[in-house]
């Protein structure tokens, strides 16, 4: 029957027939050692003729590179062995064998196990040892039946964190790999008996593995374990597991202590800043969800303390008035809020409800309240705090009527519910709910019960006593009652001393025979911050009516806070409030103190005074004059003196103001032409808008006169503030640097312009009548202002324009004939020229520059010296943070975000910022080595850039969504002289060529088949690689992990500290080896040159002159000397290298940042 198959590797037909007959009897087909490179066509059909239900297939010791898809027709195959083949990946058909229980692919060249391995739900044994695997998929942990996992002799560096979730694994062999640590989840292996992780790079073992009760053998030989682990391993398995449990407890306590916040003492209290992460990704049974952990300020909620944990449920949010059913929790160890996603039947949103903690079953029980539609409730829900699951139990008995602001507490396995505002009014009934049988009951009580009330305070004391205080009905109450659950009798307690004023919504608790009272609202709704206590009688309840305990008021040391919630538990007060006076919020009571010191101060004068005090830190040109500057200043002063003599009633010229160091400078030298690196500042509009946005406008201290101080544009950019003169100086310097013909001009401006007030701009232009007459009578405005004037002739400027620096606008009138806006500096009559005036006076004044230009000697007027201001620069972060050109830029701290983002820039296409064109995100400390991501929403394109060391050695990834490319290429043309529109090329047989022989056609056909197969394989490999990249990137983005910086001594762990030490030592070792190689290379080069010179000498010695022989001897001597020096240097380097290595190791171990974790 094997005749139709032809040759079958190295197996003869008789042997094949024998093995097929054996498969018919034993359901096991052995095709090992057959020399197969692939299973031939028809193999599956041939085997099915003999036995279609084979359960074991042996294909070991062949040259197989893949398996055909037809193999999945063996539906009953349970054992598949592919040892010692040439597989580079597990064939895809293997994952489609539903009954497979044993799979052996050891001794191949497999580099990766696909996620599809999770489809083999019946797999019991998996052997992929002796391959080139570097990682294992997370889906491996979903195999419910897996008992044996053998991955030894591979290149594993990481194990999936969920590996310990394998429920039935018994044997696990991970030896001879490159593992540096084991996942902590391996401590969850419930049935494991043998674990082999020998011959790896492990330095420690997860302490959670100390709980492996079934473990019988644990091989840790040939690793890099520290001394403590080595010593415990040698003592035996039981003692080593006990050591791991001790390590786990120690690390847990250290982690709690490390993450514990540090409080600020405020009297007897400690104040903490509560933290909350926005956008945290939380894993649930339904998948991953993103939660907002900010616990917004609310009212009508419940705050319940469970040990060191605080639970907040429900309430009305003050930010928007919405009603919520969210559950938040926080521990005293971390002071960090968490919005807990819960399962089960969640209660509807509510407020003014009651809640208590079930101590026996670890549950939070919630009753009643009001919905968002103001409907009162009387339902019961409880939350299992172990599984975070809500339940709505079915209760029996007569339940309380729907109500709000009832109070509840826990006693003897029951919830005690008292009072509240029901539909018919306030109540004073008391209910008990058995939390085991969920049975409502209302016992009969005697004595003087409290009057109906709501929002009172309730607590349990002395075992069986229930205390009730205050609350409100039509009035706010102050009475105190006690009820004994044994005698079922109510008693009102008459008190003396400083009795707390009437209040409601407060808290009471019993601690060490003292009843404490805190907080509440008084009759006017004002918050009370006082705290009271009263000593309780030591006898039975009967003594309460006659003992008259005395109230004592304590100084609570709590300032006022408009929103505060508190709990009293186990002698500790826990208060959650809005803001803190101690931790940064300004106390309003101090706002009226020191009014004399709060008078407005000129910010510029204060900055200048500070610069004068620290002038020694400024550049030398700021505090001194060069010789050239001194000559120009003398010339300018002479000119200014003559001008004042000629025009005594004119405003003095603004020529030599003082700089920020108090040194007079010529005003023209204060401009510093500078071309910055930012392209947005190369044009007029961009530079003008930048100055208006970047610098904060400050009015002049004296708006009627120019400022006494004109700081350099460098200081104005550092201060990021200034008046019109400072802003104009900065803008003119930038425009000059990019080629504009810019000047700073001085003039008068209306009050709204000087004050940068645009509220009445339109109204001022429409005023007529009396208002206009009053303005004319008051004369023209004399408020001083500065602009930037840009003249035509450069940078394609066609007409002159004036720029308002504080707004970046160009709407200033250039009509010089308008006398209301322009005033001539020199009158029409001019001034005396040198030819008409007194020559002696002119000579005395040094020319003064006041003549008409006739007979002037050019050398008399000095040239303007270079600017005393350094070249302007703007830091990148300062430039980016101003949000120019429809951009929003955000920068984050290195450790502030969970995803490692440090910069985010969003570009918009419109001024309203509604159309996003590009999003640039920069990351750091990412384990996936992601450096930058650019998203173009309009093009559905994403570009990601990676650092070295990324998976698949990725450098860049370009992802384009919804991009379909056709299979036919047509070239289209337009505007051609030959009228060509498009070209579409096809190929056919050349009719003029000689007809090929059949053998040639067969050979070509065979080669094309092989080429087609190779091409298809390349395509499949490419598709597989692309899919793996996409899957890996998806997993990385869903499980982002960050590398802890070595300088973060708070968060860095021991293994990370060890890694820092190893990197430092490796860097030193590489540098020492590199230096040794350099010395050796130079030594080899000198030795080769000497040998070549000696060979040449011996060959040409007879023809060499005496001078040449002397030169040879001199060069040989120099070479020998250099070789000797290099040999000595190499020996000394080898001797010192080891010493330097141990010296650095000792320094690292003694370093304070690493010693606590390494030693």
From Swiss-Prot:
LRR repeats (start-end): 21-46, 51-74, 75-97, 99-120, 121-143, 144-166, 168-189, 190-212, 214-235
Residue segments, region Disordered: 827-857
Basic and acidic residues: bias regions: 827-837
Keyword Ribonucleoprotein part of the UniProt annotation: no
PROSITE patterns in the record: LRR
Kelch repeats: 309-360, 363-413, 415-463, 465-513, 515-571
Pfam short name (any one): MORN_DRC7
Signal peptide limits: none
Post-translational modification remark: Phosphorylated.
The UniProt record lists the keyword Magnesium: no
Gene Ontology CC, one term: axoneme
Similarity field: Belongs to the DRC7 family.
Reported function: Component of the nexin-dynein regulatory complex (N-DRC) a key regulator of ciliary/flagellar motility which maintains the alignment and integrity of the distal axoneme and regulates microtubule sliding in motile axonemes. Involved in the regulation of flagellar motility.
Subunit relationships: Component of the nexin-dynein regulatory complex (N-DRC). Interacts with DRC5.
Listed name of the protein: Dynein regulatory complex subunit 7
Primary gene name: DRC7
